[in-house]
């Protein structure tokens, strides 16, 4: 059981200006992290950020804290989260820090860490950082203070890494692709990767101004992408979230292709190429259609708790190399160490190019069950709505009605005061009615 006070499932996150996302807290966080990480012998930390205006302020605070602890900061500028993981490994830095709130609005921000090998920090290290934060800040001797510098052509390094995950014998020259970068960290990366691999690229969501990240664009809102794909008669569309660790796709008919379908395509192609090792890891939210489709292919499937760190833990536990969330986090351990939207998207494009098949046709072997998700906001500290007898009773009624051909899942968000109500089954109208019935019970608590 974790005793972490500040760190959630994806680092520390909140509204800018409210605790804990304040300059003084982040400065002390940088100092505490520096004290803990310096014990391991390294004196440099990679710092990247997305395109939020608050990133400048938080970047400066982190730098000051790290310097006081005697560690130097290497800045990447706006850079996707998986790029920071990659650069942390290649620079042999003690850790990487990403300033981002991922898919959240611009007024939120957060801090998350990568270890020296490009994976999320273990709980024990996060707990050690929190323990250090209880102490008074002390500064190292002046001669031992950390410095700050910028990495030359960090974007170019990451672009070449992404391209190297795409087979040399294939090309994207026959594809017209609309790419939506959510006005986020991939805006100067993804279009260039696709163009350099030969694609005809139409870019949207590539004009960040500090306050428009994820605003009606990107992986969490694909309506603009769907409209543009149809208007341009493109072969497909690819959307990333604000920090580039999620990918959602759209086929030539405007149909959304989520993380479950993306993992199905990649796993099936890996099986065909004789490169799939073991099975695939999804989450409690993964569609039943994915589980059934993989079963038909003879590919083992396991569910982890929701959250990419838990998907990775389950992958490591089983020794498997592919895992995903339906939200678009896709982890391919044969390619990289964390969820990477661009790399995952490239593997789907490789399957299209190799088999001369459309994205729509690649998805045809998997029948998606209707899955309705309703988010219900609750007041933190007012008790657990999921433990209320009325909520349990309604959930039990719905589960009984669905039987073996459906599922009910209620869970708390790891980053916001939300209860997520998910109901899945074969009849969309019935599933929708059931989901709202449970959501109403949660609201009434």
From Swiss-Prot:
Processing and modification events after translation: Activated by phosphorylation.
Active site per UniProt: 102 (phosphoserine intermediate)
Cofactor(s) recorded in Swiss-Prot or TrEMBL: Mg(2+)
InterPro entries in alphabetical order: A-D-PHexomutase_a/b/a-I, A-D-PHexomutase_a/b/a-I/II/III, A-D-PHexomutase_a/b/a-II, A-D-PHexomutase_a/b/a-III, A-D-PHexomutase_C, A-D-PHexomutase_C_sf, A-D-PHexomutase_CS, Alpha-D-phosphohexomutase_SF
Modified residues (Phosphoserine): 102
Pfam families: PGM_PMM_I, PGM_PMM_II, PGM_PMM_III, PGM_PMM_IV
Keywords, in A-Z order: Isomerase, Magnesium, Metal-binding, Phosphoprotein
UniProt cofactor note: Binds 1 Mg(2+) ion per subunit.
GO cellular component terms given for this protein: cytosol
Record bears the keyword Phosphoprotein: yes
GO molecular function terms listed in the Swiss-Prot or TrEMBL record: magnesium ion binding; phosphoglucosamine mutase activity; phosphomannomutase activity
EC number: 5.4.2.10
Function: Catalyzes the conversion of glucosamine-6-phosphate to glucosamine-1-phosphate.
Family designation: Belongs to the phosphohexose mutase family.
Protein name stated in the entry: Phosphoglucosamine mutase
Organism of derivation: Shigella dysenteriae serotype 1 (strain Sd197)
Designated gene of the protein: glmM
């Amino acid at each position: 059981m974790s005793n972490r006070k500040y760190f959630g499932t994806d680092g520390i996150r909140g509204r800018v200006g409210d605790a804990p996302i304040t300059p003084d807290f982040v400065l002390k966080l940088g100092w505490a992290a520096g004290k803990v990480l310096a014990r391991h012998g390294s004196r440099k930390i990679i710092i990247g950020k997305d395109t939020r205006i608050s990133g400048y302020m938080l970047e400066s605070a982190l730098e000051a804290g790290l310097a006081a602890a005697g560690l130097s900061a290497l800045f990447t500028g706006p850079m996707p989260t998986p790029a920071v993981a990659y650069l942390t490994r290649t620079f042999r830095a003690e850790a990487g820090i990403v300033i981002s709130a991922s898919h959240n609005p611009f007024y939120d921000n957060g801090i998350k860490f990568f270890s020296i090998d490009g994976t999320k920090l273990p709980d024990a290290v996060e707990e050690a950082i929190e323990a250090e934060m209880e102490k008074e800040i002390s500064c190292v001797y002046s001669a031992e203070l950390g410095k700050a510098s910028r990495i030359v052509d960090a974007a170019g390094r990451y672009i070449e890494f992404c391209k190297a995950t795409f087979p040399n014998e294939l090309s994207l020259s026959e594809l017209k692709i609309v790419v939506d970068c959510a006005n986020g960290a991939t805006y100067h990366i993804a279009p260039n990767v696709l163009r350099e691999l030969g694609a005809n690229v139409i870019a949207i969501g590539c004009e960040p101004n500090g306050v428009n990240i994820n605003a009606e664009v990107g992986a969490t809102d694909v309506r603009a992408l769907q409209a543009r794909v149809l208007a341009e008669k493109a072969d497909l569309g690819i959307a990333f979230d604000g920090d580039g660790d999620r990918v959602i796709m759209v086929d030539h008919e405007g149909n959304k292709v989520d993380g479950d379908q993306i993992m199905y395509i990649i796993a099936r192609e890996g099986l065909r190429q004789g490169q799939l090792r073991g099975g695939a890891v999804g989450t409690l939210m993964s569609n039943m259609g994915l589980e059934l489709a993989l079963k038909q292919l003879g590919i083992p499937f396991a569910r982890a708790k929701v959250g990419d760190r838990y998907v990775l833990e389950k992958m490591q536990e089983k020794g498997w190399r592919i895992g995903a969330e339906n939200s678009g986090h896709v982890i391919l351990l044969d390619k990289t160490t964390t969820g990477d939207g661009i790399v995952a998207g490239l593997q789907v494009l490789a399957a299209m190019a190799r088999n001369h098949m459309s994205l729509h046709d690649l998805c045809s072997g998997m029948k998606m069950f209707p899955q309705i998700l309703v988010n219900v906001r609750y007041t933190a500290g007012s008790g657990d709505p999921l433990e209320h007898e009325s909520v349990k009773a309604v959930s039990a009624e719905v589960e009984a009605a669905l039987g073996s051909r459906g599922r009910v899942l209620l869970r708390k968000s790891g980053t916001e005061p939300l209860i997520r109500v998910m109901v899945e089954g074969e009849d969309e109208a019935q599933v929708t009615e059931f989901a709202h019935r449970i959501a109403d019970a949660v609201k009434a608590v």
